[in-house]
Amino acid sequence: MIHSKSISHAISALALLTSVTLLPNAMAAPAAVPAEPRLSLAQAQQIVRAAQAKAEQEGWPGVISVADSSGLPILTLRMDHAAVPAGVELAPAKARTAALFRRPSADLENAVNGARPALATARGFVLLRGGLPIKMGEQIVGAIGVSADTPDHDEAIAAAGASALK
């Protein structure tokens, strides 16, 4: 005849053995989340300086903005005598658009003007030339948006900034 006291001791011993066996797994460090490269403020400043140098060299003052990969602004610069007052709104929006769509904003302008006019209904995006993704290796880490006096100038200034980290 088995006593309830013996059963109780057996269950306690089994519970102790199970917890000791599982303890190392419970205490193991959690798996590391892979870190994505991110733009620092210093890198955003480097990008803006390169874009500003191009704008000054060519005589095309404007607004230059750098956003992170989420489209959030890191740094915006309004140069003296910026050609378009609305540039303070347009440049950050172009950077946001290029960051979130992961492509140049010119691609979206071309789509709206071509086979995808419905894209113009995408609220909160600026589908105009002058926004370019910024890459570290093959990873898009942000974008630059520029609003100067012409779309060609916007793109040239943005390209100078986007290439600053290479």
Locate each region found by the language model.
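C-terminal segment of classical bacterial N-terminal signal peptides
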Residues: 17-27
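Flexible, solvent-exposed loop/hinge segments and secondary-structure transition points
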Residues: 28-166
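Bacterial N-terminal signal peptides that target proteins for export
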Residues: 2-14, 21
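Intrinsic low-complexity, intrinsically disordered segments enriched in polar/basic residues
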Residues: 1, 7-8, 26-32
